[in-house]
From Swiss-Prot:
Classification of source organism: Eukaryota, Viridiplantae, Streptophyta, Embryophyta, Tracheophyta
Protein keywords: Cytoplasm, Gluconeogenesis, Glycolysis, Isomerase
Name of the protein this chain belongs to: Glucose-6-phosphate isomerase, cytosolic 2B
Catalytic activity: alpha-D-glucose 6-phosphate = beta-D-fructose 6-phosphate
Disulfide bonds: none
Domain of life of the organism encoding this protein: Eukaryota
Enzyme Commission number(s) of this protein: 5.3.1.9
Subunit-structure text: Homodimer.
InterPro entries listed in its UniProt record: G6P_Isomerase, G6P_Isomerase_C, Phosphoglucose_isomerase_CS, SIS_dom_sf, SIS_PGI_2
Keyword ATP-binding: no
Active site positions, chain numbering: E108 (proton donor), H139, K264
Organism: Clarkia lewisii (Farewell-to-spring)
Pfam families named among the record's database cross-references: PGI
Gene Ontology cellular-component terms listed: cytosol
Amino acid sequence: LVEKFGIDPNNAFAFWDWVGGRYSVCSAVGVLPLSLQYGFSVVEKFLQGAHSIDQHFSSAPFEKNIPVLLGLLSVWNVSFLGYPARAILPYSQALEKLAPHIQQVSMESNGKGVSIDGLPLPFESGEIDFGEPGTNGQHSFYQLIHQGRVIPCDFIGVVKSQQPVYLKGEVVNNHDELMSNFFAQPDALAYGKTPAQLKKENVSEHLIPHKTFTGNRPSLSILLPTLDAYRIGQLLAIYEHRVAVQGFVWGINSFDQWGVELGKSLATQVRKQLHASRVKGEPVEEGFNFSTKTLLTRYLQATTDVPADPSTLLPNI
């Protein structure tokens, strides 16, 4: 394809067909656009950070191996304690896309129900990943984490602020304010608050059940010295290797994603039906189940203004 497009193959970036998209950040697929955006000197530091964790993962003893320890923690939480979800909570707005990315890396890799040999797993594997930057999450779903379901949490903090603000008269600067929450939340989860403590604080009797925190809720904290390209590379590699460790322990293939295929295949059938209905006026076939047939019929009835054979039409902006 490169040659047909008129580009010398020697000027093309190689990419192995066995590398899944979720693991391609450090390949040419990720490095090229990142280099165009930030410059290769920055991306090189990112790669060096990822490589440092690769080396650590391959050489450090298990008891000091960060991805191994984190992977084993996840296996313990999921398969032994029965906690199906994990919250990824970075206390930095610059990491707002970390949780959605790790969500794909983790759930697409380890969302499997059979072993690598094709046998049904006799235990639960994989975890539901979600998250938001710290204070955003505190005012949306932390309520559930503290007093609802038990959800193991990954807290990620940064020592040095990217945007420090110092205001005269303030008790602490903006970053210390943020990090106060970072340090406090794991303690709140771990130790909670008992009815006896609340009574000592003269809390109304009828409010005590509502203000009680059970504690004993698992979390881990990662504290980065700074948030630069090198540390981001390290952080990404830690999570990638962690996911692989979980897959190794569960005996599953963390590098395929057959679960994506069925939906795509069924979507192709729907696409053919939509084309036939719009161009030829054909009714929805009996091959669809009753629910889908009903929804498709309603959808087509409500979109009769869609042209059957349009010229190129773009939205007006």
